[in-house]
Amino acid sequence: MMTIGKLTDNLQNVIDNSNLELEVIHSEMDGKNNDSFYKVTVSGGKNGNGKWGEYFSILSKFADAVESNGMEIWLVKMHNDAFDDVFYATFGIRRDEGEIGQ
């Protein structure tokens, strides 16, 4: 498995190359032994007025971009910070071999 820093950089490159309005804000390892995976949180910036539909569309494009780079991805949780009006989503991501973007 690649390092957390390399994963974060590669995921941000996938986001940037796909012109998505997301930012990787946290990455860590999770799971145990042979069932380990990366847990990655992305933020959607200020969408204003709780525009969940737009955010879901961006997250769907993010998941498609990650999958097209050979990784398995699933949604763990998502929430909205009502004070800052920022959307957050945490994903589980797994790749058995190779690197993102190769």
Locations of regions flagged by a protein language model:
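An N-terminal amphipathic alpha-helical segment
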Residues: M2-G44, G48
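Short intrinsically disordered terminal tails
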Residues: M1-M2, D9, R95-Q102
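Acidic, low-complexity, intrinsically disordered interaction modules
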Residues: G31-T90, R95-E99
